[in-house]
């Protein structure tokens, strides 16, 4: 259900600012009389939202004169694109304060004419009109690989200092073969082979970069082929 909710967010954000929502206090949750506005603090480095847009949206939600249900307000703010969690508090003086935790992009996917991020938790997030994150790119067919598999691959790359600096993009071609595009020492591509077993081959690639390329033994090549067990075939 969590994944379905996140997928729903991917498309809902584009119209969020144009839909007024009446927040009633008919269910459980703390109530607060609407004040002059809401203070917003954005948490996390990725600016999917800015304070002004979140404040305007919150003010729109609170524009009625009824008491505000802060729990419902939190749920509504959490539906904004790129928002992982929202918490709303009373400031003790009749106003409200909101903390907004934003997603951190891990990889940008290109599927046919669609492009979006997967975040570091493995959930899809729509692109932001405010900015573009510098993350590795993945081009594949729609539904070619589950998000969980893609998340595991790119999280492994991100957490490795050598690989994360070297790899710019990945292409998943026919037969689920992985082609990597890298720029360590020189621009080149890496034929990683089929999806199964990618971790061992990436560890082999990291060793080659660290012990051969960074040591200056081989710095000019067009392609590295890791499809053969225990080998790195260098092609000019």
Language-model regions: role of each:
Residues 1-42, 46-236:
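Charged, solvent-exposed interaction patches on well-folded alpha/beta domains
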């Amino acid at each position: 259900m969590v994944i379905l909710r996140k997928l729903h967010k991917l498309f809902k954000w584009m119209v969020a600012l144009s839909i007024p929502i009446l927040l009633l206090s008919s269910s459980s949750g703390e109530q607060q009389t609407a004040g002059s506005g809401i203070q917003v603090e954005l948490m996390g480095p990725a600016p999917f939202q800015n304070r002004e847009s979140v404040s305007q949206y919150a003010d729109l939600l609170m524009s009625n004169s009824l008491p505000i249900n802060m729990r419902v307000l939190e749920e509504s703010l959490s539906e904004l694109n790129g928002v992982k969690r929202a918490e709303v508090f009373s400031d003790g003086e009749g106003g409200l304060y909101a903390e907004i935790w934003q997603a951190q992009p891990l990889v940008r996917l290109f599927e046919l004419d669609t492009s979006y991020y997967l975040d570091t938790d493995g959930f899809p997030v729509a692109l932001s009109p405010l900015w573009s994150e510098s993350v590795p790119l993945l081009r594949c067919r729609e539904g070619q690989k589950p998000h969980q598999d893609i998340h595991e691959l790119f999280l492994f790359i991100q957490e490795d200092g050598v690989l994360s600096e070297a790899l710019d993009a990945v292409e998943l071609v026919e037969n689920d073969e992985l082609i990597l595009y890298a720029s360590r020492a020189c621009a080149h591509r890496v034929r990683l082979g089929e999806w199964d077993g990618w971790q061992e081959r990436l560890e082999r690639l990291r060793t080659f970069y660290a012990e051969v390329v960074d040591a200056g033994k081989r710095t000019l090549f067009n392609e590295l082929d890791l499809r053969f067990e225990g080998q790195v075939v260098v092609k000019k």
